[in-house]
């Protein structure tokens, strides 16, 4: 029924932007394109170009001007200042703002780190027009006077999350803290939110399983359809979809129960418009609304269009008799009332009790003295009927204080998961407690290495017997786990020495162990030799080793470079590392080292390279010079010679580009190996090289070829080496928020 209601709202034709998220069963706009048509848009930082802020604007600096206590007071005052153009249910906007924050943060997915509250994407299409976000345009509009007052000192993305957090506190639910630090985007991103961009509310579930790339069971929803799978009131099926959807954003069963039960303690849902009048009464979503509506959508011509006539999801009612106060009445009602399937006025499947007592009745949101029966969603009842969820609903029902504590922790995780490590947090309300989902690294309790120490360590590495290739690949494998989407991964923490990273196929565990053993030996000897408290971490030593490898490779090619090195990384422990969570950082392919696990078809490999480069926050020239340099350095996965287009493997030079663009070589597809190309000498007919689609894309794609030609030109040999060194250092520094703020 929700799908029917959504269609009636005029949203069935809304198109969502495609994505470059790589999944075997993901439909994207590149699926039917040839390799030379690879989409490079993920490498263009259009948000920076589109930003109206001054070039020297720094949010962290601007934030220092913010009076956070006054901001909080203004937010608290706003909650009970009901506006005629959108009256507050029960005289309090708190539940409305909780939904705003939840739906903003709840788009996060652990698979690729996309979504979440960071960057304020809910302000833009397609998220601002999703069916599940119906009427949240009004919530953001209610916040505008506060945003206008405080200006650049607070971002929209921080303000939206703060609104829900302050609302919780004002209604009796004490949060464990709040961190500022989210920065705003200035346009909608290209995330692929579902399998079928052509039809809103299309299912992302196949054979009962949620497609691995997504965190919502239907396009246009944050998690699941509250009526049940595909709008059918199937409690068992709803439980399965809830578990899959919440797990896709990194939530456990316990956290899932806490969030749903806690969130549905507050507010109401809206489906007041009769089913036969919905299509005529409700206008299009914001991105299709008439210009005179000024960005507000879902205009409602039924009755007053708001208040008791509000139309939202189509479900209608409240869960508890105290919808603006924290308690555990949701759980009390869940277990002590008998629930019967009914329909809302709008025709949506919901449940009402057959044995409600006067104390269970819910006050009308706008008419004093009027009472209604409480409601439950199909998804709410799943928390009772599913054995896994029931364990925690019973536990929370019997232990209200534990329920409160677990909700507070789950809310903090929900609203901060995509912010990355704690070092990115700013503001006065940061909780002291560390959580494993923050990927914590220990603080350095020792003196950092000096310039003289670094020189000594470099010599120790040179004398270790490790090859340049071993050092370079280990450093790359460590640092290249970084994801700019949720700021996870990177070299800090040295988690390449821990499970699960040490066992990943792409890291070649047996070879990795040889390198790590030698570096640990150097680390131990150095640390034991220092009496002044100076120490070096394995994380720093891995990066320093990569730098040594690059410097030595450049020297062998006739170039003297000094790689920058910034110490300060520390080593995480296995106890600080969530194995299941970190496995999502494992890549299916890494074109920089010509690696693939076989799950990505050969014609998609160039696009996965772009996706990988985007995750590393690289631009087109940086990606290009790194691939060319890595091929010349001969650091491919499993010693593959694909793309090693040089007669001096291991030397840092521009041979890859020179030979790729040399017309004396003719390229042909191999008839023996899929995804392999053979470079044949045009005169002799003999094989000269082998290459992958990733290699050849730099001569095939016009934009990439233009950059490749720059690096192949006479006179640009030193430029190539210098640019490689800069790009390499950038990758090694990804995740070093301790020195970048």
Curated annotation (Swiss-Prot):
Catalysis performed (reactions): H2O2 + AH2 = A + 2 H2O; 2 H2O2 = O2 + 2 H2O
Coiled-coil portions: none
Residues annotated as signal peptide: 1-23
Transition state stabilizer, annotated site positions: 99
Numbered residues of crosslink Tryptophyl-tyrosyl-methioninium (Tyr-Met) (with W-102): 223-249
EC number from the UniProt entry: 1.11.1.21
One of the Pfam families matching this protein, by short name: peroxidase
One Gene Ontology term, aspect cellular component: cytosol
Subunit structure: Homodimer or homotetramer.
Function text: Bifunctional enzyme with both catalase and broad-spectrum peroxidase activity.
The protein's name: Catalase-peroxidase
Source organism (scientific name): Francisella tularensis subsp. mediasiatica (strain FSC147)
């Amino acid at each position: 029924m929700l799908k029917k209601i959504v269609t009636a709202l005029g949203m069935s034709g809304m198109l969502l932007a495609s994505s470059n998220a790589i999944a075997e069963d993901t439909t994207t706009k590149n699926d039917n394109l040839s390799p030379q048509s690879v989409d490079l848009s993920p490498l263009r930082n259009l948000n920076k170009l589109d930003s109206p802020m001054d070039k020297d604007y720094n949010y962290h600096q601007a934030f220092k001007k913010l009076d956070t206590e006054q901001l909080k007071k203004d937010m608290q005052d706003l909650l009970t200042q009901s506006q005629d153009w959108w009256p507050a249910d029960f005289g309090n906007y708190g539940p409305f703002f909780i939904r705003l924050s939840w739906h903003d943060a709840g788009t996060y997915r652990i698979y690729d780190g996309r979504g979440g509250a960071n960057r304020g994407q809910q302000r833009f299409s397609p998220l601002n027009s999703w069916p599940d976000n119906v009427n949240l345009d009004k919530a953001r509009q209610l916040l505008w006077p506060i945003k206008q007052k405080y200006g650049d000192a607070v971002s929209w993305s921080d303000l939206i999350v703060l609104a829900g957090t302050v609302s919780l506190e004002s209604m009796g639910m004490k949060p464990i803290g709040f961190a500022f630090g989210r920065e705003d985007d200035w346009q909608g991103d290209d995330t692929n939110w579902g399998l079928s961009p052509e039809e809103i509310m299309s299912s992302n579930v196949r054979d009962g399983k949620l497609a691995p790339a997504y965190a919502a069971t239907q396009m246009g929803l944050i998690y699941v359809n509250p009526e049940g799978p595909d709008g059918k009131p199937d409690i068992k099926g709803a439980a399965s979809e809830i578990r899959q959807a919440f797990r896709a954003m990194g939530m456990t069963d316990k956290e899932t129960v806490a969030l749903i039960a806690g969130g549905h303690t507050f507010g109401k849902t809206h489906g007041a418009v009769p089913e036969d009048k919905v299509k005529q009464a409700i206008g299009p979503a914001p991105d299709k609304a008439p210009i005179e509506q000024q960005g507000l959508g879902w205009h409602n011509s039924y009755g007053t269009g708001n208040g008791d006539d509000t139309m939202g999801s189509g479900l209608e009612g409240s869960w508890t008799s105290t919808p603006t106060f924290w308690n555990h009445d949701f759980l009390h009602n869940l277990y002590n009332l008998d629930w019967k399937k009914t329909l809302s006025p709008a025709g949506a499947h919901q449940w009402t009790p057959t044995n409600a007592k006067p104390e269970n009745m819910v006050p009308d949101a706008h008419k004093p003295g009027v009472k209604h029966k409480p409601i439950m969603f199909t998804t709410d009842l799943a928390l009772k009927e599913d054995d896994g969820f029931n364990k925690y609903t019973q536990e929370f029902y019997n232990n209200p204080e534990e329920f409160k504590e677990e909700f507070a922790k789950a809310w903090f995780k929900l609203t901060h998961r995509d912010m990355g490590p704690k070092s990115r947090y700013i503001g006065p309300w940061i909780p002291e407690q560390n959580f494993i989902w923050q990927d914590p690294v220990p603080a350095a309790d020792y003196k950092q290495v000096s310039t003289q120490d670094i020189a000594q360590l470099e010599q120790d590495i040179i004398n270790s017997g490790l090859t340049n290739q071993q050092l370079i690949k280990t450093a790359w494998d460590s640092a290249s786990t970084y994801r700019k989407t949720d700021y996870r991964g990177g070299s800090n923490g040295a988690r390449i020495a821990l499970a699960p990273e040490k066992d990943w196929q792409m890291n070649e565990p047996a070879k990795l162990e040889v390198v790590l053993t030698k570096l640990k030996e150097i680390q131990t000897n150095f640390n034991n030799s220092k009496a002044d408290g100076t120490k070096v971490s394995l994380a720093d030593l891995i990066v320093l080793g990569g730098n040594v490898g690059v410097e030595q490779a450049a020297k062998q090619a006739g170039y003297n470079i000094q790689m920058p090195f910034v110490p300060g990384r520390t080593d995480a422990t296995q106890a600080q590392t969530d194995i299941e969570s970190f496995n999502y950082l494992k890549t299916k392919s890494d074109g920089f080292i010509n690696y693939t696990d076989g799950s990505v078809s050969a014609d998609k490999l160039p696009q996965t390279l772009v996706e990988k480069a985007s995750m590393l926050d690289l631009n087109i020239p940086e990606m290009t010079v790194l691939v060319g340099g890595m091929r010349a350095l001969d650091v491919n996965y499993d010693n593959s010679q694909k793309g090693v287009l040089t007669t001096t493997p291991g030397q840092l030079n521009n041979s890859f580009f020179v030979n790729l663009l040399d017309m004396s070589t003719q390229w042909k597809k191999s008839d023996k190996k899929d995804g392999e190309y053979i470079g044949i000498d045009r005169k002799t007919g003999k094989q000269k090289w082998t290459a992958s689609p990733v290699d050849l894309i730099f001569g095939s794609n016009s934009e990439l070829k233009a950059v490749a030609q720059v690096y192949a030109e006479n006179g640009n040999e030193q430029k190539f080496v210098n640019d490689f060194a800069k790009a390499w250092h950038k990758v090694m520094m990804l995740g070093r928020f301790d020195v970048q703020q």
